[in-house]
Amino acid sequence: MASGKEIKGKIGSIKNTQKITSAMEMVAASKMKKAQDRMTASRPYAENIRNVIGHLANANLEYRHPYLEDREVKRVGYIVISTDRGLCGGLNTNEFKKVTKDAKKWQEQGVEVDFAALGSKSCAFFNRFGGNMLAAESGLGDAPSVKDVIGLVRIMLNAFNEGKIDRLYLVFNKFVNTMAQEPLIDQLLPLPKSEDKALKHRWDYIYEPDPKPILDTLLVRYIESQVYQGVVENAASEQAARMVAMKAATDNAGDLIDDLQLIYNKARQAAITQEISEIVSGAAAV
C-alpha cells in the first residue's frame, strides 16, 4: 500500500487538475452561448437560401447552370469541418468515422476521393488517412466569419468547375442540443433538388436582364453560406461537447479524490493502530 504522504500528493495533484477542468467547463459554457447566438442568427438565411436553391433545382430554367446538372461520378470531394483543439469528447472521432466510412464506399466503386480540411484536427487526421488533400485551413478562432472560408470554398468550386471532382459534400457536426451533436454529410454539388413532398407549390422565375450572371453569383453565395453555417454549427457543437466532457472530468476527479481519501484514512488508521500496538507491546515487556 502507498504511504500516506504519497496518497496526499496524489490527492493534491488531482485537486489541481479538478480546478482546471472546472474552469474549462465554465469557459466552454460561456463560449457555447456566444456560438449558439451566431448559429441562431445565421440559420434563417442559410435555410431560406437552401429552400430557394431547392426550388431552382426543380424549376424549368431557361439557363441550366452546371451546378444544377448531375454528371457521372469519377471523383468526389469532401469539405470536412473539425475543431482546432481537443478535449471535446468523441466529437471529432465520430465525425471522422462517418466521413471515412462514406469515402470508402465511393472508393470501393472505383471513385477517387479528395478532401478539404477546415480545422487542425481534420488536417492532421486526413494527412494520416490518405486521400488527396486539395486545401487546408485552421485557426478560425471563436468568432469565424464568411471571409474565413471563402478561400477554401473557391478551391473546391474551381475543382468542380474544371471537372476534377464531380460531387462535393460538406461534413460537420450539427448542434442538436447541449447533450447531443450529430455528424452530418450534406451534398453541396450538384445542388440537391427539394423533395416533391416538401414543395407546397412550384415557383417560376424571371431573370432581368440575364439569368447567367445572376445564377453564377447566387449559387456561389449559396455554397459559401452553407459552409459558413457548418462552421458555426460545428463551433457550437465543440463548446457543448467540451463543456460536457469537462464536467464529466470534474465529477470523475471528485470521485477519485473521495476514493483516495478513504484509502488515506485507512492507511492512517492502520499506522496509528500499529503505533499503539508497539507501545502496548513495549510496556508489557517492561
From Swiss-Prot:
Question: One Pfam annotation, family name?
Answer: ATP-synt
Q: Where in the cell is it found?
A: Cell inner membrane
NCBIfam families from the UniProt entry: ATPsyn_F1gamma, PRK05621.1-1
Topology in the lipid bilayer is annotated as: Peripheral membrane protein
Q: Name a single GO cellular component.
A: plasma membrane
Q: Which GO terms describe its biological process?
A: proton motive force-driven plasma membrane ATP synthesis
The similarity comment for this entry is: Belongs to the ATPase gamma chain family.
Q: Which CDD domains match?
A: F1-ATPase_gamma
Could you tell me which HAMAP family the record lists for this protein? Answer: ATP_synth_gamma_bact (MF_00815)
Q: How does it assemble?
A: F-type ATPases have 2 components, CF(1) - the catalytic core - and CF(0) - the membrane proton channel. CF(1) has five subunits: alpha(3), beta(3), gamma(1), delta(1), epsilon(1). CF(0) has three main subunits: a, b and c.
As one GO molecular function, the record gives: ATP binding
Its function, per the record, reads: Produces ATP from ADP in the presence of a proton gradient across the membrane. The gamma chain is believed to be important in regulating ATPase activity and the flow of protons through the CF(0) complex.
Q: Please verify whether the record's keywords include Cell inner membrane.
A: yes
Originating species: Pseudoalteromonas atlantica (strain T6c / ATCC BAA-1087)
Q: Which InterPro entries match?
A: ATP_synth_F1_ATPase_gsu, ATP_synth_F1_gsu, ATP_synth_F1_gsu_CS
What PROSITE patterns does the entry give?
ATPASE_GAMMA
Q: Which UniProt keywords apply?
A: ATP synthesis, Cell inner membrane, Cell membrane, CF(1), Hydrogen ion transport, Ion transport, Membrane, Transport
The protein in question is named: ATP synthase gamma chain
